Amino acid sequence: ARKVCGDALEMRGGIGYIEEFATPRLLRDAHLGSIWEGTGNIVAIDALTRAVGRHGADSALAADLHARLNESANVPVAWRNRLRELTDRAVGFAREVAGRIDNEGDARRATSLLYHVASAVALTWEGGRIHEMRGDARRLLLARMVIDHRVLPGDPFQLAETATQRKIT
């Protein structure tokens, strides 16, 4: 939120920072979240220890993601199986991190992986439904890009965009 509000101020050339528009209020509100909630790492630790460690929300999340993949019969089986595997790995990693206080250093990575895998599953589920209605499979491609760019390890010596990805975009 802070980045978006800051970019909005820059787009207006700084105009709006002093109460001409709603932007300064939005910027202040965006900063309040991190002030009240704490840094991303603290929020990640809290989310894992409470949601996963105490309340078992990881099981509900995994069940929902698997159900969405099961509902996506028109999505290629290989892609659904890959997402099932990544879902299980992300949930397992979150459980491992939540299981011991010594693992707090990995909390941000665990919550980010859960987020990215859940996003890819949601995009796949939506993409399958949209493809059935309109023949548009772009969300399936976006799901693939989320996994490629946010979950799978990248080679720092490789171009950021492959030939396949250039065709997609």
Could you say what each language-model-derived stretch is?
Residues 1-169:
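Flavin-dependent oxidoreductase catalytic core characteristic
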